[in-house]
Amino acid sequence: MSCRAGKKLFQWSRVKSSTEEIVKQLTVPLREHAEPILTLTPEQKREAVRLKIQEIEHTKGQPPFFDMFMREHTYLRISLTEKCNFRCLYCMPAEGVPLKPKDKMLSNSEVLRLVKLFAAHGVDKVRLTGGEPTIRKDIVHIVEGISSTPGIKEVGITTNGLVLQRFLPQLRDAGLTKINISIDSLDREKFAKMTRRDGFDKVWKAIELARGYYPKVKLNVVVLKHQNENEVVDFVNLTKDRNLDVRFIEFMPFGGNEFKNDNFIGYREMLNLIVDKYGDGVIRLSDSPNDTTKAYKIDGFQGQFGFITSMSDHFCNTCNRLRITADGNLKVCLHGNSEVSLRDRIRCGDSDEQLSEVIQKAVNNKKARHAVFRNGRSEEPAKSSNDSYRGLTPVTSASSILVHLPSSSLYHSHLHSSRHFFISQIRCFSTTYSVSSITHLLTHVDNNGNAKQVDVSQKDTSTRTAVARGTIILTAEISRQISENTIKKGDVLTVAKIASILGAKQVANLIPLCHPIRLDFVDTVFNHDIENSKLHCISTARCSGNTGVEMEALTACTIALLTVYDMCKAISQKMMLTNIYLVHKSGGKTTYTIDNENQI
């Protein structure tokens, strides 16, 4: 080897090593992406949630939509149409996709009603998507209606830009605050190949027009290997003297786009290309809360760039997004198949309260992460909501435990039901209260210490809710068979769920001084801790009446656990029911909420 050749090889190795080292530093996860969404102590979390809910309920009047992982959903994406005037390679086949009839699509008024409903629950950001949203003829009126909805702070649109010039001035005047334009190549021929349409000039003119209207315009670039990855640096160069935020999007699988791993290029590989060009001039920026983008910029450049890394490094921990399809289906995860039709509910005459319950139920079923990244490998999107990965069967209102945290005292008037027990506790604490001063606190005991039923005829009728929790400790074998649904008697959790409903209906026949109640709703959900051989149960009861449903919730929970015992006792009697307690009650004179049994 000549001296000159050896010198070149040394220089190349040093550059490569330097690039790898820079990329390694640049891809260290930021705290908001590397850590779970909740990093507070339990006490801090309870206080933060209580204050946040108080703030939102004070201004909006409705509790926010929290999922079972305490992610608050404040961002709504609405697809306005299935139609598109492009046929992008990564999005749909050349012949397009089958379209639903127009009467199956959400109307203008239905869209605005849903926006108003979500805004009442704390959603403050709405983005309009498609298909191509600018195809919709009433797009300007929709933007105007959304922007004028109380509580909505941002209205954005994601568009391919083909006809944007025609509408942009009107959209801005109507209240459009954010704009994302999709453009996957800066080469006209390649652009036409990737979109199967000749529209580069119109799209570029739309970008330039938008730059004059908005302080920052986002460009969405889906990067495909062997297609446009060689343009990554060219797109970054656009940010030198332009107010652009270029977002490189990893190719994702979804219906109709014929996803192939051969076309996939991860963000670290893209970042390598940029660092090879700019070296340590690449700067990592801080990401905003709930941001989907890992943000960067080149030192001295006006704009910035980033990566949406749904495939290689998910951002599910901070996901605050919900989606409504053009035909009115609610999706809590882009990668999930689970949907619920809000359109059908609206057209059947559901009230806003009923719609809110449907939405909360769907949000409760949102998984910790989208299916593509379970167990560290790529998998098919979830087919069933009864998912052992989460250990949760479908839930309805368990998260209401978290969205009704009170600021009032945790005193519970039915905690002690025995006069003797109450007085013995008083002696332990050296108090000097008389029996008569104590028994008036016990609503089922008169001044002489005799049992009585409470007269509820003068109480106001209101919606009463109660939630109870309990646990059954299992053997490892029973736990395994429940998870695999191989118990000989049948589906344990389904039978226990039904039994809990039947049990709640029998409370007045079982507890002597309880009033018969017309229940509006009873539901039980299970959280199976397979590793520790525990099955946790949460039961919710609700009624519209003049007395509470705490006993119904507690009975439902207890009966559910007893049913599990009965279904499994042929395997082993070594099971124990434990920690059955009231978690939450609301709707009456007092509200009561507790996070765990240690607070009792």
Curated annotation (Swiss-Prot):
<keyword id="KW-0408">Iron</keyword>
<dbReference type="InterPro" id="IPR023045">
    <property type="entry name" value="MoaC"/>
</dbReference>
<comment type="subunit">
    <text>Isoform a and isoform b probably form a heterooligomer.</text>
</comment>
<feature type="binding site">
    <location>
        <position position="88"/>
    </location>
    <ligand>
        <name>[4Fe-4S] cluster 1</name>
    </ligand>
</feature>
<dbReference type="InterPro" id="IPR000385">
    <property type="entry name" value="MoaA_NifB_PqqE_Fe-S-bd_CS"/>
</dbReference>
<feature type="domain" description="Radical SAM core">
    <location>
        <begin position="68"/>
        <end position="284"/>
    </location>
</feature>
<dbReference type="InterPro" id="IPR002820">
    <property type="entry name" value="Mopterin_CF_biosynth-C_dom"/>
</dbReference>
<dbReference type="Pfam" id="PF13353">
    <property type="entry name" value="Fer4_12"/>
</dbReference>
<feature type="binding site">
    <location>
        <position position="252"/>
    </location>
    <ligand>
        <name>S-adenosyl-L-methionine</name>
    </ligand>
</feature>
<dbReference type="GO" id="GO:0061798">
    <property type="term" value="F:GTP 3',8'-cyclase activity"/>
</dbReference>
<dbReference type="InterPro" id="IPR036522">
    <property type="entry name" value="MoaC_sf"/>
</dbReference>
<dbReference type="InterPro" id="IPR007197">
    <property type="entry name" value="rSAM"/>
</dbReference>
<keyword id="KW-0547">Nucleotide-binding</keyword>
<dbReference type="InterPro" id="IPR050105">
    <property type="entry name" value="MoCo_biosynth_MoaA/MoaC"/>
</dbReference>
<dbReference type="GO" id="GO:0061799">
    <property type="term" value="F:cyclic pyranopterin monophosphate synthase activity"/>
</dbReference>
<feature type="binding site">
    <location>
        <position position="319"/>
    </location>
    <ligand>
        <name>[4Fe-4S] cluster 2</name>
    </ligand>
</feature>
<keyword id="KW-0411">Iron-sulfur</keyword>
<feature type="binding site">
    <location>
        <position position="333"/>
    </location>
    <ligand>
        <name>[4Fe-4S] cluster 2</name>
    </ligand>
</feature>
<dbReference type="Pfam" id="PF01967">
    <property type="entry name" value="MoaC"/>
</dbReference>
<comment type="pathway">
    <text>Cofactor biosynthesis; molybdopterin biosynthesis.</text>
</comment>
<feature type="region of interest" description="Molybdenum cofactor biosynthesis protein A">
    <location>
        <begin position="4"/>
        <end position="371"/>
    </location>
</feature>
<dbReference type="GO" id="GO:0005525">
    <property type="term" value="F:GTP binding"/>
</dbReference>
<feature type="binding site">
    <location>
        <position position="218"/>
    </location>
    <ligand>
        <name>GTP</name>
    </ligand>
</feature>
<feature type="binding site">
    <location>
        <position position="131"/>
    </location>
    <ligand>
        <name>S-adenosyl-L-methionine</name>
    </ligand>
</feature>
<dbReference type="Pfam" id="PF06463">
    <property type="entry name" value="Mob_synth_C"/>
</dbReference>
<dbReference type="GO" id="GO:0006777">
    <property type="term" value="P:Mo-molybdopterin cofactor biosynthetic process"/>
</dbReference>
<keyword id="KW-0456">Lyase</keyword>
<dbReference type="Pfam" id="PF04055">
    <property type="entry name" value="Radical_SAM"/>
</dbReference>
<feature type="binding site">
    <location>
        <position position="84"/>
    </location>
    <ligand>
        <name>[4Fe-4S] cluster 1</name>
    </ligand>
</feature>
<comment type="similarity">
    <text>In the N-terminal section; belongs to the radical SAM superfamily. MoaA family.</text>
</comment>
<feature type="binding site">
    <location>
        <position position="316"/>
    </location>
    <ligand>
        <name>[4Fe-4S] cluster 2</name>
    </ligand>
</feature>
<feature type="binding site">
    <location>
        <position position="77"/>
    </location>
    <ligand>
        <name>GTP</name>
    </ligand>
</feature>
<dbReference type="InterPro" id="IPR047594">
    <property type="entry name" value="MoaC_bact/euk"/>
</dbReference>
<protein>
    <recommendedName>
        <fullName>Molybdenum cofactor biosynthesis protein moc-5</fullName>
        <ecNumber>4.1.99.22</ecNumber>
        <ecNumber>4.6.1.17</ecNumber>
    </recommendedName>
</protein>
<keyword id="KW-0501">Molybdenum cofactor biosynthesis</keyword>
<comment type="similarity">
    <text>In the C-terminal section; belongs to the MoaC family.</text>
</comment>
<keyword id="KW-0342">GTP-binding</keyword>
<dbReference type="InterPro" id="IPR010505">
    <property type="entry name" value="MoaA_twitch"/>
</dbReference>
<feature type="binding site">
    <location>
        <begin position="321"/>
        <end position="323"/>
    </location>
    <ligand>
        <name>GTP</name>
    </ligand>
</feature>
<dbReference type="GO" id="GO:0046872">
    <property type="term" value="F:metal ion binding"/>
</dbReference>
<feature type="binding site">
    <location>
        <position position="91"/>
    </location>
    <ligand>
        <name>[4Fe-4S] cluster 1</name>
    </ligand>
</feature>
<feature type="binding site">
    <location>
        <position position="158"/>
    </location>
    <ligand>
        <name>GTP</name>
    </ligand>
</feature>
